[in-house]
Every structure is written in C-alpha cells, then in structure tokens.
Amino acid sequence: MHQHPRSPAPTAPTSSARPNSSRSRELDYRPNSPAADVRVHNSRGLGIETEPDSSGQTVQPAKEAIAKLNQIISNYHTKAALIILHSRIELPPSFNKGSDTPRVNRWFNVEIEDTDVLREQLRTWRTCDATENRPPPLIIETYLDTKGLTNNQTLVALDENGKRWDVLEALAASQQAHPVRPPSASSDDVILERWRVELGDTSNALPADLGSILPTVYKKSIVLFRSLFTYSKFLPAWKFAKRNGRLRANPALRIKYRIIIGSPNQVSSKPDHLTMPLYESSSKVVETYSFGVTDSPAGPFSAQVTYRTSCDFRVDDSEALLSSRFMGADDEIFRPSLPTRVVDSKVPPPEIGSLPQERRTIEDPDPGRAYGSLSTFHQVGPTTSASPISALRAKGKLGTSSPSSPGSSSRKALAVAKASPVGRAAALASEGSPGVVRRPSISFQPFKAPPLSASPSLVDPPLSSPRSVSGPRPHPPMAASARKSFPAVQDNSIASPSSASPRPSSISRYSSAFSHRRGRPSSGGINKLEDDTSSGKASATSSAQPGSGLLAEPTGTSADSIHADDENISEFLKMLDLRKDLLNTSGSAALDATARRTTVTSAALTRFQRMRDSNAALSDSMSSSLLLQRSSNSSSKQLSGVPPMVAGTSISTASSPGKPISPHTPHTPAIPSRLSSNSIVDYTHSEGNGTELSQGHGSPLDENTSDGTTMEHGPSAVNAIDIPTSPRLFPPVYRRSSSAAHRPRTVAVDDDEIFPFNRSVSLGAEERSNLSLGALHRQHEYESSDTATHRAQREPRPMSSNEDAVVPPSSITRGQGSHKGVTPGPTVASSSSSHHHVYQPRFSHSRGRGSSGGHHSLSSGSSSLARGAAITPGLAERESERDGNGSGSNSVTSAMEDRRGVGRRPSAGRGGPPQSAQLEEDEPLLFAMSDFGASRRSFEEGKHVNHAHDPTGNIAGSRRGGSSRRGGGFHAWS
C-alpha cells in the first residue's frame, strides 16, 4: 500500500517532456525571422531532464540551428554586395507583387533597397549552407572600362601635380613586363576597388548549443555592416562616382562592377590591374582596409577592401595629349619660344606728373592702334605727315611710315606746350606711347575767321601759331624740287593751297598743301615771318586744329611737335632720299588698304572743298575793300607800327594792314561786316602842315568836314557780309572791342543811311554822335571856361596797361539827356580825333589805347561837348598844337584824368554848365557801371600803351575807339 500512491510520479516528467520537445521544435523554425534567437531554450537552466534534452538535440534542434545559421551566412554576403554596389552604382529597385513600393532589405539593422539585378549573380551565396555547400569568397570589383572610348579619346590619369598620364599606355607597359595576368581582368580595364567577403574555414564541428550562439553572431554582424556602409562612402571611388554623376561625364568614366567567385587561396605573386602603377609617384598605388572578423559557429566572417589611392581620371583628346607631350608643356623640359616684348633699359622712365616721353620705335609699333573702331583703320606708328592727301599716300611698309626716332621731339614739344595753349594741344596730339595713344583727328572750324573771343591772349608769349614753334619752312622754290621722288597718287590730285580743292598735283617736294595761299593780293605772307605775324591766318593754318591733318607741313604733324628742330628735318629728308620706293603703290593689298584709309580723309577733303567758294568771295571782297580804301586815302599813309624792313608791310588781306603786326593780331577780316565796324586799321599820320586836324590824329573825317565835301570810301562801296549776331539777354552794352576798331574811318555825311545796318552791332553802330555846328560852338564855349578847373583837378597817377581809357564825347550828353529830355541836334558826319569814329560809346570810361594829346585835346576834350556845340578854327588849331606836343606819358595821364573827372563834366547841351551837385549825382552811376563790366574787358587791353611813338609824338597804339561800352540805356536815332 505504501508504493501505490507513488505510482503517478514518473508520468509527470514524461508529460512535461512533450511540450518541452514541441517548444524546441518551434524554435528550430524561428531563425527564418531575424528576431528568432531571443527565446531559445528557456527551460534549460533547471538542471532536470538531461536525458530527454540529449536525445532531442540529435534529432530536431540541430536542423533548426543549422537553418538559422544558413540564413545568416546567405544574408551576410548579399547584404555586403548591396551596400558596396549601391554606393558606387545606381541599381534598379525591386517591387513586391501588386505594390508600387520598393522592397527594402532590413537585415542586420541596415535598411537598403533590394534589387533583383544581383539575384542571379549572387545565387551561389544565396543557396550555400554551413556544412555541405560552403560559400566561396565573394569578390566585387569596381572598374573603368575603356572600350567605350573613340579613336581620338584617351583615358588619362592626373597625378598630384596635375600632370596627365595615359592609362592604357601604362597598362600596356605593365603587361609586357608581366605577361601573366589574373583571369578576372581584361586588358583594357582599370580596377578601382576590390572587395572580398569571405567565410573562413572551421576545424570544429557545430557546437551543441548552436541555437544559443546565433543571436550573438547576429548582433555582432550589425556592427560590421554599419561600419561597411559608412566606410564605403569615404573611399576615393565613391568621390569619383559622385563627381561624374553631377557632371554627366563621358560614358567611359562610369564605374562598372563585376562579382567574382574568389578562390580560397590568393596568389599575391601575380600582378593585376589594381596594383599596377599608372604613373610614377612616391605614394602608394593601393591600400587595403579590413573590417575585422566576426566569429560564428560556421567559421569567421571577414570583409576587406583594396582600393586605389588616386581615382582622378578624365578623358582627353588624343592629339592634344600628344602635342602637349611633344611641346613639353607638362614636364617643363622644353618651353615654346613665344615672342616676348623686351623693354629697353636705356630708355628713361617717364617723368612723374608729365606726359609720357617715350613712343614706340619704328620697328616696334603698337598693333592696337591700327583699329580705332569696327569700321576705321589707322596706320600703325607715327606717320610722315598728317595731311589727308599724304594719308592716302601712306601705303608703304609698316616700319618705314615714321621718319623719326622715338623721343626725338618730346622735350621740345613739352616746352612748347607749357608756353601756349595751341602748342599744348599739339603736344598732346603728337605724343604717343603704349599708355597714351592718340590719333590725328580731322576737324574744321565752322567759320573762316575765329570770333572776337578767339583772339590770342595778351599774357601769352609771342607764339602766334603752331607753325611758329619750329624752324623755318622750306622755301617754295626749294619745295618745288623736293617732291620729285614721290610717285603719283592713284587719284593724281592734292589739295589746292588756297581752297583745299583737289587739283592736278604740282611737282613740289616736301611742301605743305597750305604753306602759302594763292598768289593774289589777299594771300598770306610768302615767307614764314609774314605768315606768322599776319592776323588773317584763320583760313587754313589757324582754323585747323592741331593734329587735324589739314596742315601737311614738312616736319610732321601740326605744331611740329614730332620734329622740333632742323636736325630732325634734315634726317627726315635724308631718309626720304635713301628710300626712293617709300610710297610705291604696287600690289592689290596696298590699294585695298588705301581704299580703307580714304573713307575718313575723303570726307574731310570734300567738306573743306565746299568752303572754297566762300573763301574766294571773302578774298575778293577783302582785296576790293583794300584797293578802294587805299585809293581814297591819298595822303601817303605808311605802316607806322612796323619797322620798314619787316616782311608783311605789303598790303595783304591775310594781315590787317594798319595794325602793328604781331603774333597776337586778332583774326578780323578787313571788310565791313557785323563783326567789325571799322574796315581797315591804319596807324598813319599826315605829313602836311600842322594846322590840319588830320595832323594830330590823322582823321580823314576832319578833312572831309573842313572841306565840306563828301567822299565815298571803300567800306561804303563794298557790300557788307551779313554775319548774324547771337541773341543776347541784355542790350549789347558790354562788348569787346574789335581789332579793326583802331583805324580812322573816312565816312561821308550821308553814311547815316548805310551804317546803321552795315556797322557792327558789337561796336556800337547805334551810338553815333554827329554834332551839329551849334552844338560844337556851345561845347567850345564851355570848354574854354572849364579849362582852369580841370587842370587844377588833375593829379598824376600811374595807369595800368589795360585801363588806358579815353573819354568819348557823347556819353554824358546821352546819359544826362535821357533823364532831362534833351534831344540831340542835327547830326553832321564829323569827328574830333582818330580814335573817335562816327559812333561814340555811352560812357566815358571806355578803354582806349591812350590819348595822344593833352587833357583838352579833341580826343579828350570832346567828351564834354554836347551834340549841339560847334568847333571853331581857333579851337582846332589849339588842340592840334597840343596834340603835336603831347607825349605818351601825358596822354596816359590825361586819359586817366578824363576817366576820373568824367563825372564832373556836364554837357553843354542843357544850355550851360550844370551845378556841382548834379555833376556828383552821375559819378556813382558811372563808376558802378564800370565795375559791373570789368570782367568783359577786351583781350587787347594793356598792350598798346607801350607801342612805339610816331615821329610827331603820337602813340601808335592810341588809335583805339570807344568800342567797348559800359553803359546801358536806349538811344534813338537822331
């Protein structure tokens, strides 16, 4: 009875062993899932039922553990291949059935898109196991295939210095040295990397606790694949693949791969394309990185990579690579002999703050100067002449186009440029350097004579024209025989000297087209001195700007700034004699170059040709005006301001005949026009007796008045050129004086009908003071009574050169008469001095050139005469005697006293001497108007006070009429 209750005890462990075995059977199928190794053998730590466990291990647990181990081995290889190839190559994704979502491989806790492309290539590793079919080593090679290159393309490798190396040539050289090559590589592949994933051999049998070891193997593999995923993006091949993917490079640069079944035993003695050096370098060709070993019951898992340290490849042109090798551009063994500009060390550097002194030599011109724009072509280097005609001739060689050496005229040209504005412009036009490149321009003045404001300034040194800078020109006879060696131009025409119109070329050598004008009385001086000192050089020589090309002077461009001395001229002539064929027109290329250069110069010549008719009409008008004037003045007038031997005393319209000839003579034509009121200026004096009024001042008006006759003179007989004046904001009060306003006008009584229209508005044509006999008589009476008062008031004071004023007659009369209602009396064409013409300025402070007589001479004393006064013969004799004895200093002093005491001289037109209070009222107004117009003084002030005296004591520069007015107000014609 005791054993009966103990009978069911053995049945309990038996029943408990069944669920234990069934649970272990379920665990054998769990390795199909990555998380299956978590709950393996939960009841194994109890220490009981050891026999059933041992019997169960031999049956089912081994199969389940082996299945799990086989899954780990298979995914180990496939996952490594996906990570390596996805980082180098774009693999197409795979999709599940009925879904558009790409299938993702999540083994070893690394998510990556799965692909079906590698399924067949990795079939060997997908079907392997740990016991019977062990996997071979997985080898993945990435490489560049050169089969896609064309015949003119070459795969080159760049070293660390950027030098190009032919890859195929390096591979061929290595194959000759090592004919044996691995079977996996072809002859035209460049292997970049070689990956090796391998399961090592094991000598031990599978352990009994295989199920408990597999979760540890899985966890260790997660760390391996994460490091593989990261490190694969640090290698040079990945950088090379990404760069080509962005640039869309040549197809030959796309990385390709191949999966190779590796051999268990590597043969390192055989060279392969991975370890072949492509160029000489001190660095390693390849490097190897191992990811460590992961132990498993089936054997050690390992992964390593061998990669090229430099993957800088590109595809270049084969011919470019070959030529660079021949030229030695890469290895710097041979440098091409490219011409370099050598700077002459003997040439001094340019001065600081000045124009560049140096110019390019004849042999080394600047080619950049040849093309000024898209449509213009210019001759390179300095030209032999700036004339438009010689520009047509300049078809010679490049080196022979310049007659001078560099720097031959720089010093002297700059010295001239500092002296005068004209020379400065010429020096700027003539200087040439790589930094400052200037071309001669062709321009014309719109007028045949410059305006009055263009007269040379008195403060400039006597450099009248650009041509007066250099030495003398060749004389026309010499110049006529000098151009014989020049061949005829294609159009066989040069510019005419006077009208610039093309005509058949006269045989002359080295002569300027404008060196002298036509041989008529109106032409300029024959020699240089006369041409330089004439005031009418406005047509060809003065009107053209420096460097314009109109002045084809023998010594270079205008202003002679290229050749400034006779030595350079002689060298130029010698060079022309040596080079007889300098301007030969042989060859069609030279003719084509001429046609291109003719475009600018022909237009300039055509424009200047249209000025011929007006210039000829001007010359004829000037000639007739001169002849009529000289025939009317039959008192044997001579040029008093010029020495008798000075060239230029011959009458010429190019120079004002009566004015002292100087380089600063204003360019004013000697014909009546609206630019000048007095046609001809003549510093002459009559050599008759001293009782005539013309002896003191040479006034033909006094002769006409005393004789009572009427003479018709040249200016009134010639039709005036109607030159319109510019509109002005204010009345024409503050006008400059004209250079032609210094000659006594011989005007008849009936000029009243002509001169309001033919007289110059700028010289006050509306301000004529024609005094009647009654007015002159009353003026004489007041003059005799006021003599003592004005003499007591005179005090000598020095007078500046630009304030030698004369008191005009009608200023106070008009100024007071306009307020008091005094109407001028009948007009008579008479004047009282040579520098008081038919018109008179309004105020008495107009700037004259100085009075030749005393204070009460007719030139100064007439300022206090009213229009209704009369002049008696006694007064004329007394004033004439005083004028004959007056000196230059007295005239200056008296002229200044006239200006100072002008406010105290009342007009007799009011019936008698006014009170002193009324005299002082006008004085502030007169001086205020004088200060108001002080800025508009003439250019010619202050120059003529110091002129030479004539034999009777008169100052040559004192024939200055009151042509510049300083007062306002309207004056009605009387």
UniProtKB/Swiss-Prot annotation:
The keyword Protein transport appears for this protein: yes
Compositional bias (Gly residues): 964-974
Basic residues bias locations: 834-848
Bias type Low complexity, positions: 12-22, 401-410, 450-470, 493-514, 535-544, 629-640, 854-870
Key words of the record: Autophagy, Cytoplasm, Protein transport, Transport
Domain of life per record: Eukaryota
Entry-linked PANTHER family: AUTOPHAGY-RELATED PROTEIN 13, PTHR13430
Family of the protein in this entry: Belongs to the ATG13 family. Fungi subfamily.
Name of the protein in question: Autophagy-related protein 13
Organism per entry: Aspergillus oryzae (strain ATCC 42149 / RIB 40) (Yellow koji mold)
This protein's encoding gene: atg13
